[in-house]
């Protein structure tokens, strides 16, 4: 038996050597190995405006159906059309997202920009319709609140804001649209929001927006975006007070940045407590996104010759360098930016993509250096948009902590509204970028060119005039 086994085994070993042809081995001599297709974890490479438009349309179609603009009886669900007779049973019809949250303020600004970039009127109509609806129903809910002492909590956020979260982002978006459409009846809402921001929001002794949580006299990096863009926009809305509001916006920005920016990291800390002898650096990604977005919003409004514009720009560019150095190989950024074992987060990534693309489009930063970063980031963000149009991988609302575990274990959820506006805004700005720059694959890498390259060769040089159209 052992003899037979050995004989058969010997035959099996010998047969392949006789029967099989010699295979060609891919090696350095016969193959340009540097052109082998890499095993990317996500999408990498070419991107078209049409492709981006399809992605943001999917998100738009989802939020459009999930944010109805109707008043209903909370007990019966019946739609109320006569607002003059409604009582405390009236509330906004509930969808997946709130119409007057700060997250939706970002969404409104994003859709205003998307309408400009794409010419798609649906985006503009979405914002117009909801702003007109809120302006129409707000006085009736105010009447109910005056008579009954209570009304829908979502309207109270508009009528009686108690934090910058309640006021700033929606106020800024309303001003943007009001400046484009003089018939938009939101002046009363704008004034109510802005009165809170400029006159009632808690501040440090030097006037910096602050909170008394989680500690007394705490600066939240988030509040840069929750307050400063609205003040900057007010300089365009109330032109008689333009200089006052520009000065206030710049003052707020620099007083936040001087305390919270960490030069050696090129990042912002999330929180700063006035009474603390040390100021820990937990560089939460989304808050850093709000800070970068605030700089963009402020620079958009500041005149080129404004005395402190260079200082704002210096902070912005230093922040861009710090953030882009920490992008993951998948294209997303980490929840705590400088801690690679924290999870990859979508909303912050989308904000960075918008800011980078916007800054390139404005000529503030270099397309060669940062265009590929933005494009990789967009590919990663687009990969987080599911078939229904929901945005996956977004951290839920987050407070402040001075330990890493808090940030590492924040849940993610498709109903975290923070992801939708940034994704729409990033997509709109990427479309603008792709329409003005000319990214092309060269030696397997994304490169950005100011002029369209004629060649389709996998590797090419650009030092000859005949490569350009």
Write out the residue ranges for each language-model feature.
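CBM-like carbohydrate-recognition segments
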Residues: 21-103, 117, 122-124, 129, ...
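Extended ligand-binding groove/face enriched in aromatic
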Residues: 124-128, 135-272, 388
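Extended ligand-binding clefts on enzyme/binding-domain cores
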Residues: 218-335, 342-353, 365-399, 403, ...
């Amino acid at each position: 038996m052992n003899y037979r086994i050995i004989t058969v085994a010997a035959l099996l070993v010998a047969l392949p050597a006789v029967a099989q042809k010699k295979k060609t081995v891919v090696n350095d001599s016969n193959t340009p190995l540097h052109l082998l297709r890499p095993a990317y974890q996500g999408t990498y490479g070419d991107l078209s405006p049409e492709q981006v438009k399809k992605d943001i349309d999917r998100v738009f179609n989802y939020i459009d159906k999930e944010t109805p603009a109707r008043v209903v009886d909370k007990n019966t669900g019946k739609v109320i059309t006569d607002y003059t007779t409604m009582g405390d049973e009236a509330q906004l019809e509930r969808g997946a997202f709130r119409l007057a949250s700060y997250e939706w303020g970002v969404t409104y600004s994003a859709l205003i920009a998307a309408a400009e970039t794409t010419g798609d009127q649906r985006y503009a109509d979405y914002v117009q319709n909801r702003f007109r609806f809120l302006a129409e129903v707000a006085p009736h809910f105010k009447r109910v609140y005056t008579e009954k002492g209570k009304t829908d909590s979502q309207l109270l956020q508009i009528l009686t804001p108690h934090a910058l979260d309640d006021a700033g982002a929606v106020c800024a978006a309303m001003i943007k649209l009001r400046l484009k459409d003089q018939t938009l009846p939101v002046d009363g809402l704008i004034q109510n929001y802005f009165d809170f921001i400029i006159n009632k929001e808690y501040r440090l002794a030097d006037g910096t927006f602050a909170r008394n949580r989680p500690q007394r006299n705490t600066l939240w990096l988030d509040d840069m975006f929750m307050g400063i863009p609205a003040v900057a926009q007010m300089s365009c809305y109330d032109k008689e007070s333009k200089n006052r509001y520009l000065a206030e916006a710049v003052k707020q920005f620099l007083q936040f940045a001087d305390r919270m920016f960490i030069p050696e990291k090129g990042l912002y800390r999330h929180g700063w407590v006035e009474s603390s002898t040390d100021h820990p650096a937990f560089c939460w990604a989304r808050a850093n996104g709000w800070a970068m977005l605030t700089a963009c919003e402020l620079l958009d409004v500041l005149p080129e010759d404004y005395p402190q514009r260079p200082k704002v720009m210096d902070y912005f560019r230093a922040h861009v360098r710090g953030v882009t150095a920490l992008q993951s190989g998948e294209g997303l950024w980490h929840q705590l930016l400088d801690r690679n074992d924290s999870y990859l987060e979508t909303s912050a990534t989308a904000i960075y993509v918008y800011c980078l693309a916007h800054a390139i489009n404005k000529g503030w930063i270099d397309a060669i250096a940062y265009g590929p970063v933005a494009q990789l980031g967009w590919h990663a963000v687009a990969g987080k948009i599911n078939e229904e149009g929901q945005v996956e991988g977004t951290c839920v609302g987050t407070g402040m902590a001075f330990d890493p575990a808090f940030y590492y274990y924040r849940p993610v959820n498709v109903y975290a509204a923070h992801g939708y506006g940034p994704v729409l805004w990033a997509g709109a700005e990427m479309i603008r970028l792709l329409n003005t720059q000319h990214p092309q694959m060269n030696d397997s890498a994304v490169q950005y060119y100011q002029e369209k390259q004629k060649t389709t060769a996998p590797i090419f040089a650009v030092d000859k005039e005949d490569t350009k159209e």
